[in-house]
Amino acid sequence: GYTGEEMKLVNETRKILDAPQLMIAPTTVRVPVFTCHSVAVNAETEIKVGAERARELFARFPGLKVWDDPAEQRYPMPVAVEGQDDCWVGRVREDLSHPSALSFWVVGDQLRKGAATNAVQIAELLLDS
């Protein structure tokens, strides 16, 4: 069955995206790193996006940086992004099992983005509106 942490991921994602029927099948694993959460994502889209277009779209998001060099096998690792406010995405590729699916890897320092920095950024958005 699913763990409590996995169900929290399902429920919170659906709530944040206001998508109660969103299909999510997470697996969480505790690994020995001091900071940073990492997630391997497999996402099916309504229309085919393609890896290059996905990289372009990811690069437009404030607070998300693309670090993806498949030829050199360079992509975000927790030790490299620790202490940074941004989240990082890499390993962007078209999924071989579905024509409109992508797989990618995301890393972020939860002590920055998941906590203090996020609170400040939300407050700034509220003050600007």
Q: What label would you give each PLM region?
A:
Residues 48-82:
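Terminal hydrophobic/aromatic helix or amphipathic segment near a protein terminus
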Residues 23, 36, 71-74, 101:
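Generic, low-specificity signal for short hydrophobic/alpha-helical stretches with a mild N-terminal bias
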Residues 21-24, 65, 102-103:
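Structural motif
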